[in-house]
Swiss-Prot record:
UniProt membrane topology term: Peripheral membrane protein
Pfam (any one): ATP-synt_VA_C
Lineage, top ranks: Eukaryota, Viridiplantae, Streptophyta, Embryophyta, Tracheophyta
Protein family membership: Belongs to the ATPase alpha/beta chains family.
Gene3D superfamilies from the UniProt entry: 2.40.10.170, Bovine Mitochondrial F1-atpase, Atp Synthase Beta Chain, Chain D, domain 3 (1.10.1140.10), P-loop containing nucleotide triphosphate hydrolases (3.40.50.300)
Organism of provenance: Dennstaedtia punctilobula
GO molecular function terms noted in the UniProt entry: ATP binding; ATP hydrolysis activity; proton-transporting ATP synthase activity, rotational mechanism
Record's protein name: ATP synthase subunit beta, chloroplastic
PROSITE patterns per the UniProt record, alphabetical: ATPASE_ALPHA_BETA
Length: 486
């Protein structure tokens, strides 16, 4: 069926059809033609509303420059479908599943619609198990669930993208299977950095693209809101193929889920809906639920989703992060205070949570160590006001010891990342869970009280911290002798 455009408002089009030929909601419409300069136009839109008088309102997934009233819009009769399967690995696709890198078209015989139902309740798998990330503070305090949903919460500039990139690197190498990464409304530079990092670490194999382990789907900041709103669904669809057809365990990375919400807010206003709290769309909960409920584990395979969540003005009660956190199994909250001290990853040990932090899941030893770290950190937080007003010397001997150990824990929580070697100047470290538990177990009772604080900073494990302390001592002695002779 062919309709014609009656109105264009930014990325939103009104299209009139003949009586009885109206497209369904979510059907894709294709507008083809030429602009006044003679350039070809090919715009795909998605039907969002049926207006009456045989008109529909659709949202464009690409720029509407050059479109004019009266141009024809073809109803494809189905929702947007994208290529899925092994041919997408090693490639960068856009929201339509079209490749945006150089190696040519994606040769796939299988396509899935991007709007799919969540698995039925009877298909879900409720098995509880953790997976190791190699990041000390995460594995100890807020372990991630295999087949769960995890959120990295943080304001602007506290370091969300670097941990996401590190996790892609660690999991793609250690996990060995395939993964899918969705760039939702983020910077083009970050997408390019991730692509280069993947090629460097051989997760994307340019020589033999079929051996690549990751599929990338990008809808970056400069895209229209229709593309940014649906790129998360495209990434989920690609991950669902590996879960349902190949029966694999698939990590799905989304950076950044708030851009999905913001795109929905832009579209909602253009569709004429009354805004809700803080200007967000009234359908925020429904839109978030329809995306998040598809990301789950079934008896056939699993999708483990790790999502970066931008927190506007560092306010975790903002409707967007608050709605997101309701769907998550673990939250890793990044602290601006820790980032200001140069402690990366700036994970807040007290705000970060996980449903897996239970003694019958992670084991008594792990649980007790994590609780000890949290108690020490909480006591340090309580004492900070007293220290700021009266100074450290006014504390009791016991409290001074607690503060010293808490500061050591804080610094030992920092870790050099493989993807951040150029920034830190230290080789990246993957730290196993037994090493992590051993390190914090030694700090808590005071076995490392003789080590200077700076020895724990950017150290992978206890052995490295001890070696750094010895090096610092030698350096200090050398400087001391130099001062005497000078």
């Amino acid at each position: 069926n062919v309709g014609y455009i009656t109105q264009i408002i930014g990325p939103v089009l009104d299209v009139a059809f003949s009586p009885g030929e109206m497209p369904n909601i979510y059907n894709s419409l294709v507008v083809k033609g030429q602009n006044p300069a003679g350039q070809d136009i090919n715009v795909t839109c998605e039907v969002q509303q049926l207006l009456g008088n045989n008109e529909v309102r659709a949202v464009a997934t690409s720029a509407t420059d050059g479109l004019m009233r009266g141009m024809g819009a073809v109803d494809t009769g189905a929702p947007l479908s994208v290529p899925v399967g092994e041919t997408t690995l090693g490639r960068i696709s856009n929201v339509l599943g079209e490749p945006v890198d150089n190696p040519g078209p994606v040769q796939s015989n299988t396509t899935f619609p991007i709007h799919r139902s969540a698995p039925a309740f009877t298909q879900l798998d409720t098995k509880l198990s953790t997976f190791e990330t190699g990041i000390k503070v995460v594995d100890l305090l807020a372990p991630y669930r295999r087949g769960g949903k995890i959120g990295l919460f943080g304001g602007a500039g506290v370091g969300k993208t670097v941990p996401i990139t590190e996790l892609i690197n660690n999991i793609a190498k250690a996990h060995g299977g395939v993964s899918v990464s969705g760039g939702v409304g983020e910077r083009t530079r970050e997408g390019n950095d991730l692509y280069m990092e993947m090629k460097e670490s051989k997760v994307i194999n340019e020589q033999n693209i079929s051996e690549s382990k990751v599929a990338l789907v990008y809808g970056q900041m400069n895209e229209p809101p229709g593309a940014r709103m649906r790129v998360g669904s495209t990434a989920s669809t690609m991950a669902e193929y590996f879960r349902d057809v190949n029966k694999q365990d698939v990590p799905l990375f989304i950076d950044n889920i708030l851009r999905f919400v913001q795109a929905g807010s832009e579209v909602s206003a253009l569709l004429g809906r009354m805004p809700s709290a803080v200007g967000y769309q009234p359908t925020l909960g429904t839109e978030m639920g329809s995306l998040q409920e598809r990301i789950t584990s079934t008896k056939e395979g699993s999708i483990t989703s790790i999502q970066a969540v931008y927190v506007p003005a560092d306010d975790l009660t903002d409707p967007a992060p608050a709605t997101t956190s309701a769907h998550l199994d673990a939250t890793t909250v990044l602290s601006r205070g820790l980032a200001a001290k140069g402690i990366y990853p700036a994970v807040d040990p007290l705000d970060s949570t996980s449903t897996m932090s239970q003694p019958w899941i992670v084991g008594e030893e792990h649980y007790e160590t994590a609780q000890g770290v949290k108690q020490t950190s909480q006591r340090y937080k309580e004492l900070q006001d007293i220290i700021a007003i009266l100074g450290l010397d006014e504390l009791s001997e016991e409290d001074r010891l607690t503060v010293a150990r808490a500061r050591k824990i804080e610094r030992f929580s920092s870790q050099p990342f493989l993807v951040a070697e150029v920034f830190t100047g230290s080789p990246g470290k993957y730290v196993s869970l037994p090493e992590t538990i051993k390190g914090f177990q030694m700090i808590l009772p005071g076995e490392l009280d003789n080590l200077p604080e700076q020895a724990s900073y950017l150290a992978g494990n206890v052995d490295e911290a001890t070696a750094k302390a010895a090096a610092l001592q030698v350096e200090g002695q050398r400087k001391g002798w130099y001062r005497i002779f000078a």
